[in-house]
Amino acid sequence: MVSEATRQAARARREEILEEIEKNHLKELYPGSGKCMLISGMYPGVWLEHAYDGVAYADAVGQRAEVARHQIDLFLDGQREDGQFPFRVTAAGREYSHLQECVPFALVCDLALRRNGNAGLREVYEKLKQWDAWQARYHTDERGRLLTFCGWDTGHDHSRRLADFGIYETAATTEARDRPQQHAVLPLIMPDMNAVYYGDKRVLSEMAGRLGLPAEQARYAREAEALREEITVTCYDAADDFYYDVDCHGNRRKIRSIGVTALFVSRFFEREEGRRVFSRYFRSPEYFGTAYPYPSIAVSDAAFEKNAPGNSWNYYAQGLTMLRSLLWMDDYGLSDDLEANMERWVTALTPRSAVPFGQELDPFTGAPSSASPYYSSSMIFYLAALRRLGI
């Protein structure tokens, strides 16, 4: 429960956040872009993994649907002729060195379009088809599994998942299609990245159905299911009831990462499987069920360590994880858990601190890390929580 004192303070913080967003985050990135939701001073511009920020903000404040559309247009307009989307758009330009999609962009586009009368559905669908084809051409293996070429493909900075990537822990080249050569473990097959790829195909199938394209609807549904089967065979460990990364030699790398939540976001998990995995891992303090959910690595894993003062996907509970939980927890029948998470984050974020509304929290104490004050995902989740909790 959120105390009455915290509830009163939170109402004042809400006004502060709205003012902060209006002043420093809702900006045109370049002439004609329309106002978009920028991330923070630490992270200029908008990353592809933050495309959902526009939709989430519009939902959290109950208006400003145009921001959701402007957010996706940053990437749709930046698509190369070969189909690749930029991983980041800033006032200085567009960058294409890695993937870092993290949430199915097709899903975000669908949500943004629905909030804007579905205008331009066919045009967006065609662009998403090109993105799917680009990934198939440059970033998959012979079995259709999406490959991880570098650490930044994942968005999980400082995670032990990337421990032996060497120069590829970040992005070693300026082109996302450049494949590591003769590397000890790369390319990897990661369940979260493949779930995102699956999610894109799943939404493409749904869009094709709405557009009256039954052959394409069936094709993308078939490809999505084939990918799900491949990733289950490759990454699923029945004894642990968990999905793990697999290296280029077929070895499973047994780190329980918060990346598993991408399998919920993308609806890779059927409802029963998702609820089972959630009950075992997310309600237990041995894994992800900490006081301030959810740590980026299960706390009982040998890899779990506070290895950086901030921006660590090896320890902290991330605002991004919480914001993305709005995309799946209700649909899996986990509404009570979602609201409990909201109460904990509101309790942690409301008191004033040196890093207001930062990127991440200590999963045990709720103290902010050093990373990124006034971080978009944390602010938007806070607004969504206040709205939902009636504060």
What is each of the regions a protein language model found here?
Residues 5-20, 64-77, 117-136, 200, ...:
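Extended, well-ordered alpha-helical scaffold segments
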Residues 55, 198, 205, 261, ...:
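Conserved small-residue packing positions in alpha-helical repeats and bundles
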Residues 44-51, 55-68, 72, 77-166, ...:
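Aromatic-rich carbohydrate-recognition surfaces in CAZymes
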